[in-house]
C-alpha cells in the first residue's frame, strides 16, 4: 500500500465577517459600517478586527500594541462639538500627532507599567474599549479590575435551560442580569412558574446566546464609545461635576456621591492608561454608566449660575453651546442603549435628573406621559417592591428608595397638574420604606479613588432632611389625591383620618426644620446678609451640605420645608371651597381663610428668587404648580371680594410672582436648553410662554381693568415704608382683633392712620410674617346649608376643624417677638434696599396680615 502524501498544513483564514453573522453561521456581505444581514435583522453589527501572529501563525484579536498609531484615525473621526478643544493640547482628542509630555507624578492607584502619561487623558477608541482579555498577558495591567459597584457585576445568564430545584422560589422575583439590568416578575405574569422564575427572563430579553465577554447586543457599543468624543476636557468636566454636587444633588439626592466620584475618577484613570489597560469591570458590565456621566455633566452645566462660567476652567466656553452639545450627547446615549426597552438604574436616574432641564415647564400632558412611562419603567425594575431587594447591598437598597419616592413625588405633581388620579396606587406607598437621614457608604471603593472627605463621612445630611420631608409629604399627598378623586364621595371617617395624618406629618416636618442649622429665621424672611448675598464662586463653603453650621443650603431647606406645610393645608382645604360670593358672609370667611394661606405661601416663596444666594437652586422651583395655584386663588379672591378690605399685601405678592414668571419669557434666555421650534414663538425667537402662565397674566390684567382709578393702589414707596416699618398698616387687622381682647394695644391702633403707600414693608426675601398673638379665627362652619354642598353636618365640622388647623400654619411674627434670642444681632437682615440691622430685636416687626377677618 503506497504511503500517503504528507498532509499540508494550512494557515487559518482571517475572518472578515461580523460577529452576528458568524454566530448565526450565515454568509456576511461585509458591508461597512453594518452588513446587509444585520440591517435586515435589526441587529447591532459589530466587526472584530483580527490579526495573524507571525510567530505562531494563529489568528487573534487585535490588541492596542498591534496598532502603529492612533493618530491615523483622527482624519476619519467626525468633527468635535467643540472644535477649539481639538486644537488644545489638553483636549480629549488633540489634532497633534504626538501626545503631551508625561507627568512627573503618578497616582497611587495608577498602573506603573505605562511609560507615558498625559496631564489630561484622552478617551480611547471603541476598538480598544471592547478588547477581550484573551490576548493579554497575565501580568498586563488593568485599572482596578475589581468592580466599584456596591454589588458584584451582574451574573451571566444561566446556561441551563431548566433551573435546578435548588433555586428556591420567591414570592417577588427580581432578576439581576448582565449590563445592570434588573427586572421584576410578578406572579400574575403568564410566563411565571413558581420555582422556575429564571425562565421568565427569556420572555423579556433576547440575549440568551450573547457571549458573556462581549457587549450586550441591544447596546450599540461602537456608538457609545465613539460618543465619548463629545466629552469636555478633564478640567471642564471636573468643574461641571463640582457644580452638580453643589446645585443639583442636594435637591435630588438620587445618586451615591462616593460611588459616583469613584466611578468618575476611575473612568478618567482608564483614559489616562487606555493604551495598556482595559476599562473597569463595572464599565464593561454596564456601559450605561456613560449615560449617567453625560447626564451629570449636562445637569451641572444647566444649573450652573452665571458666575460659575467665569471659572478658570470654563473661560472661553459659552453656556448655551456647552449645554446644547451635552444635551445632544446625553439623549443620544439613551437611544444607543435603548433605555425604555432595557432600563438600568443608571439610565433611570439619568432620566430623572435631566427631566427638569429637558422638559418645558407647565406642559401637563407631556408631563403626564413622561411620568406614567417612568412609573412603569420603575415598576419593571422592582422599585415598588422592597421585599424583593434582599440580594442587593444596603447602598443599592437606599438609592432605590430615594429613586422610588422621587418618582412618587413626580406622580403627585403630575396628578395635581392634570386633575387625574396618581399612577402609583396606595398599595405601592406602603411597600417601600422611607429613606434614611444619614449618608450611606459603600464597602468596596478602591483606596486610591476615595472621594472628598465631605462626601464619605457618615453623618447627618441636610439634603436628606429635605428629601425626607418632601418624600413623606408626597406619600400623604398621594393618599389625599386618591381619596378626593375617588368615584365615591369623601367620607367623614376617611377624610378625618387624612387630617389627623396631616397634623402628624406637619409635626414631623417641624422636627426636621428644628434639625436644620439656622441663623436668623429664613422661613420668616429674616436671612443674614452674609448668606443672602453669598455666591458659590466666592464662598463655596456656604453651599456645602454641612449640618454643623448655618449655610445657604440650610436656609433654603428651611424655606422649602415650610412651604411643604402650606401645600398640604391648601391641598386639603381647596376642594371644599364654595363658589366665590361676596354677598355670602360664609363664603367670604372661607375664601379669606384660603387666601391667607396662599398669600402666606407666596410671601415665603418670593425669597427663593429674590435672594441672590439661592440662584443655584432656581431651576428646582421653575416648574412647580404650587405658586401658580396660590396666584390663581388669590386673583379670584381679589376679583370677587374687592370691597372686603385692604389687600395690599395680596396684590404685592401676586404682582411680584406674575412679574417674575413673565420676565422669564420676555427675552431669549441664553442659558436655556429648550431650543426646539415648539419652544419658541415667531416674535424674535422668544421662549413661548406656557398656557398656564398666560391665563394668569390675562386674569391679572382683567383685575387691573376692573378696578377704577380711585381703587388702584399707588406704587409702593419702599423707602418710606422702610422708615415706618414698625408702623406698617399690616397691623390693622391685628389691632382690630386685639381690640376685642382684654389688653388692647394702643401702639398698633395708630397704624390705621399710616400713609397708604406704606401698607406693605420691604419684602426682598419675603414680607415679614403674619402676626401671631390673636390670629383670625376660622368660622365654625364653612357652609351655611349642608344640603347645598352635598355634605352632612358632621363632615362640615371636620372641614371647620381643618380651617382652624390651616390658620395655625400662617407664620406668626408674635412668635418671633417671643423668641428674640433666635435672631443674631451682629448680622444684618437682607431687604430690598440693602442690609438692615436687627440689633433692636423687636423693632420693625409687623403685627398682622392685611386681610379682612
Swiss-Prot record:
Cellular compartments per GO CC: nucleus
Protein's UniProt keywords contain Nucleus: yes
Region (Disordered): 54-122, 138-166, 734-775, 833-853
DNA bind region: 18-45
Pfam families given in the database record: Fungal_trans, Zn_clus
Gene Ontology BP annotations: DNA-templated transcription
KW Lipoprotein (keyword) present: no
Cross-referenced InterPro entries: Sec_Metabolite_Reg, Transcription_factor_dom_fun, Zn2-C6_fun-type_DNA-bd_sf, Zn2Cys6_DnaBD
Protein localization: Nucleus
Keywords attached to this entry: DNA-binding, Metal-binding, Nucleus, Transcription, Transcription regulation, Zinc
Biased composition range(s): Polar residues: 104-116, 141-163, 738-752
SMART domains membership: Fungal_trans, GAL4
Predominant localisation class: nucleus
GO molecular function: DNA binding; DNA-binding transcription factor activity, RNA polymerase II-specific; zinc ion binding
Job description of the protein: Transcription factor that regulates the expression of the gene cluster that mediates the biosynthesis of macrophorins, isoprenoid epoxycyclohexenones containing cyclized drimane moieties.
Miscellaneous comment as given in the Swiss-Prot or TrEMBL entry: The macrophorins cluster contains a single gene insertion (encoding for the terpene cyclase macJ) compared with the yanuthone cluster that produces the linear compound yanuthone.
PANTHER family assigned: UNCHARACTERIZED TRANSCRIPTIONAL REGULATORY PROTEIN, ZN(II)2CYS6 TRANSCRIPTION FACTOR (EUROFUNG)
Protein name: Transcription factor macR
Organism of provenance: Penicillium terrestre
High-level lineage: Eukaryota, Fungi, Dikarya, Ascomycota, Pezizomycotina
